[in-house]
Amino acid sequence: MTDTAPTPEKMPQKIVLVTGPSGAGRTTAIRALEDLGFEAIDNMPISLVPRLLDGPPLARPLALGLDARTRDFSVTAVADLLHLLAEDPRADAQLLFLDASPRVLTRRFSETRRRHPLAPLESPMDGIARETDLLAPIRARADVVIDTSELSPHDLRAEMLRWFGDRDSLRLAITVQSFSYKRGVPQGTDMVFDVRFLRNPYWEDTLRRLDGRDARVQDYVSADPRFDSFFDNIASLVRLLLPAYREEGKSHLSIGFGCTGGQHRSVTVAEKLSAALVAEGWQVSNRHLELSRRSIGAQS
């Protein structure tokens, strides 16, 4: 039996060209595509785009941001690029055009106090009118047009997911870390749990030099009569919140467990929660801050 499934070398390179008037949300859209697994390149010279197809196949789809500030940008250059990509079997390209009403664009420029790139010495309204005329032929050729006039950044991210991703594409990267309260709570930790109420293996001579990755330490900590109830409630809370965070467009969540020394109890709970989440299909990485410091110190 012959395997006819396409090989990665034969799969066309997915490319989304993102353009639109200044202030319509192009940067937000590109960041959303990046969260969906795209490799994002903003303001790449148009003449260089075809060269991306000449190199080795890329593992991820491409999101390319183009606007009036892009080098060699013109209606003709964009039209030629679209024609070239449409004719090249190595490319699967779409043109996304983000738009907004002149009133909304004017308000956004006023709120940010930015100068319009096409009218740096004039009012934003002059630049908006000029850019609208310039981009009209490109808008007419777009595969997808999204009007962001009434969209919040969160709404725009949801639109990007609807058009260019699926629920599994918007992966939430989770970091579960242990730390010592002697050094304080790590910066950037979203959820913090204090596990110093659990019994401490430090006071057992046979466990003192071990850490929470060791099964003997985990068994000791788990034997605390309060452990099961505590862990089950924490795990249930995290399971409840993770889908909600993902739906809100959050791309990373950091969960921290702290104990006195950052060696036994916090490591144990972090290891167990990580294992439970990985078993459920979540993308999880572990960080044991105190253990890492000791490893570095031992090597230096």
From Swiss-Prot:
Pfam families hit by this protein: PapZ_C, RapZ-like_N
Biological source species: Dinoroseobacter shibae (strain DSM 16493 / NCIMB 14021 / DFL 12)
Binding positions (GTP): D67, A68, R69, T70
Name of the molecule in the record: Nucleotide-binding protein Dshi_0209
GO molecular function: ATP binding; GTP binding
Gene3D superfamilies: P-loop containing nucleotide triphosphate hydrolases (3.40.50.300)
Family membership noted in the UniProt record: Belongs to the RapZ-like family.
PANTHER family xrefs: RNASE ADAPTER PROTEIN RAPZ
